Amino acid sequence: MRQPIRLLVVSVRFLLVAASGILASLPAFSESLEHCFVGNYHLEDRSDVDISPSVDGTLRWRKFDGTTGALHPQANGTWTSTRGWTKAADGMVVSFAGCDGNAIRFGGIAGTRTDFDVHEITFESHGTRLVGRLVLPRGEAKVPIVVLVHGSEHDSALTSYSLQRMLPAQGIGAFVYDKRGTGKSGGTYTQDYSLLAYDAVAAATTTRSFAGARLGSIGFQGGSQAGWVVPLAASRTAVDFAIVGFGLAVNAIDEDQQSVELQLSEKGYSRGEIRDALKVARAAEKVIASGFSNGFAELDRLRSRYSGARWYKDLRGDYTYLILPRSEAELRIMAPEFDWHTPWNYDPMPVLRSSRTPQLWILGGEDYDAPSRETRKRLQSLIAEGRDYTVAYYKNAEHGITLFEVDATGERISTRYAPGYFQLIRDFALHGTVSGQYGDAELTRPLRHD
């Protein structure tokens, strides 16, 4: 089983599964534990560890070097850790000083929770009340501030986004908000990129107003679906930088096509077999893009033709696999719960070509949910044309820029974030550029930096 919740990550595929009820079955995190222990702690070895709420009564720790694990409560009041999103114990024991304290002992190293200047803020966008939080390092100095933009997740960013603390611990402010239809915000959940971009612009405007004299520079950061939203938002308001993780420079139909191709090619199927699989996927994509209103005859014809093919059992894509086993009647019933106004054929390239905002894109070579090959190629072509883009490519990273193991059943299990991932975000927010080495990331920088 791959990791259930990632930092700022929920792909279209994961989002569709969630809407089918899987996420709804996860128990809510204990409010008391969240209140007591969530925070960013500075340790005596001069590193920081962030503690965030998770599922099934657990906590999640993250360090800036990319290591992470789940914390499980024990009867003696301590917490034991399992590595990444695996079930393997990593030997880490953690204890807290109780609900009235700010102390932690993390793997034998003492630490203290870091205090930030925190402002809870309500603002409006297109008639919808949104709830946000501005988190700043303590002091009076000007700081860059990152507006954290959602992926496609349904959960509350105010609760789940650990960057709202990890960045301030590095001297960078963060504005986090629950997008419409999630958490404490009003409105209806949507995947309308344009509307979400206007919400992000409203968040940036609110940030400028509340940060006042402390605002140095300002920019957007987001992952996955935010790869479509962030550049749109940056085209509508003046910002100093934009950071996209595991996003796409193609549309959502191409996303599924490329996912099918990557998955089947890695399983060793021939080019001819993959071409046939892509035909089936294209028929499924047409059904979902139509709002489950047409395309069923072609889908049925191709399913009947290829259901006996050896590759059919491995045909998944980003969302094709949800369509394949269901009848027309079942799919039509599903239509209302997927009525999210998703612009399936949205072309992001005109916005990317016209951008004058320095942008950092962080991509994973093993990303099944948002395959990066064509996106990387397109971004590199923009760099060759003189655009101000930086691409950091982690060959072995999957969606979320996490590394993984493969278990005996062939399932990926995420183990940690790629080394250098969080440092990339920090340095680009601080300087509008990156320099040096970030783990094994392959960097393509704008021509002006060469």
Language-model features, listed with the residues they occupy:
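Short beta-strand/loop motif that positions the catalytic acidic residue
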Residues: S355, W361-L363
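Accessory cap/linker subdomain of secreted extracellular hydrolases
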Residues: G245-V351
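N-terminal cap/lid segment of alpha/beta-hydrolase-fold proteins
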Residues: R105-G139
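The serine-hydrolase catalytic nucleophile loop
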Residues: E153-R165, K179, R373
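Conserved alpha/beta-hydrolase "acid-adjacent" motif
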Residues: Y368-E374
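Alpha/beta-hydrolase active-site loop
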Residues: Q191-F210
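Conserved alpha/beta-hydrolase
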Residues: L167-K184
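Short beta-strand element of the alpha/beta-hydrolase
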Residues: K142-G151
